[in-house]
């Protein structure tokens, strides 16, 4: 790619679509992805942050509107869809969570719908929003799938991890939680260091696997769309992009479901009294 950011080869096209719209937190200026090195700790992917917040607000507004206008008569299509989603999530929570918290069902609903909406951004034409961003708003880069950004998925997983610690301490107490980390699986004081390492790794692996699984699947899906658009002639792209998009609908739904299920299971395990 030239210094001006002109796209001249398939390699340039693919690289351009893998760049984030970034803000340098030290200068509060947009980062030029074509003239700077790799991202540092002080760069913020504001495209991922923007779309994740907008989609989260859209979820809240739509569900609030449906709840406010819900009727006991014949429901409309939107109300029916919302009721089906709520019923599905509620049944999942009843089957997998055995505690008494009233927060888990709303949390599971939020996680499922929010992740699903972010995943669905991958079904938009790959050049649509980046083209608008570049030619209308003058943005140097734009990626529109928040869950294809590891910082977003790990941030969500970090929130789940904090809830795991909270519910573990709430149900078992500080002493019980500490004992769980130091006296399992070997119930003898001499094995406390070994137990702490084993249980610590097990505890930390939960948010890591949760975030990286979602990121890996969505990044791979986005990359395949980019490769199809970047390597094939325009008249032949639909032969691969349409079947992949149909198959990808299953992937994005499944990944949202898996993220929700693992969140419920981890919190159920944390809420168990020993």
From Swiss-Prot:
PROSITE patterns: ATPASE_A
Membrane spanning stretches: 43-63, 103-123, 149-169, 223-243, 245-265
Keywords, comma-separated and alphabetical: ATP synthesis, Cell inner membrane, Cell membrane, CF(0), Hydrogen ion transport, Ion transport, Membrane, Transmembrane, Transmembrane helix, Transport
Tree of life domain: Bacteria
Gene3D superfamilies: ATP synthase, F0 complex, subunit A
GO molecular function terms listed in the Swiss-Prot or TrEMBL record: proton-transporting ATP synthase activity, rotational mechanism
UniProt record, GO biological process: proton motive force-driven plasma membrane ATP synthesis
Protein name in UniProt: ATP synthase subunit a
Gene designation per UniProt: atpB
């Amino acid at each position: 790619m030239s210094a001006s950011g002109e796209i001249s080869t398939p390699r340039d096209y693919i690289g351009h679509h893998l760049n984030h719209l970034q803000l340098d937190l030290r200068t509060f200026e947009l980062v030029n992805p074509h003239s700077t090195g790799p991202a540092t700790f002080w760069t913020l992917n504001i495209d991922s942050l923007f779309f994740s917040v907008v989609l989260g607000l859209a979820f809240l507004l739509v569900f609030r509107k449906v709840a406010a206008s819900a009727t006991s008569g014949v429901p409309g299509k939107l109300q029916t869809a919302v009721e089906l989603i709520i019923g599905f999530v509620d049944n999942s929570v009843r089957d997998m969570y055995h505690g008494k918290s009233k927060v888990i069902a709303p949390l599971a609903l939020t996680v499922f719908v929010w992740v699903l909406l972010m995943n669905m951004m991958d079904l938009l034409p790959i050049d649509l929003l980046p083209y608008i961003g570049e030619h209308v708003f003058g943005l140097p880069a734009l990626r529109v799938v928040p869950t294809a950004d590891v910082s977003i998925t790990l941030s969500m997983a970090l929130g789940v991890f904090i809830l795991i610690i909270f519910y573990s301490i709430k149900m078992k107490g500080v002493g019980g939680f500490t004992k769980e980390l130091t006296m399992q699986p070997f119930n003898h004081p001499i094995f406390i260091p070994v137990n702490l390492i084993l249980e610590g790794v097990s505890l930390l692996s939960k948010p890591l696997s949760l975030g990286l699984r979602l990121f890996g699947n969505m990044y791979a899906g986005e990359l395949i769309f980019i490769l199809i658009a970047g390597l094939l002639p325009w008249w032949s792209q639909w032969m691969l992009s349409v079947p992949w998009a149909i198959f990808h609908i299953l992937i994005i739904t499944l990944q949202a479901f898996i993220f929700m299920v693992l969140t419920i299971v981890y919190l159920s395990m944390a809420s168990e009294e020993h």
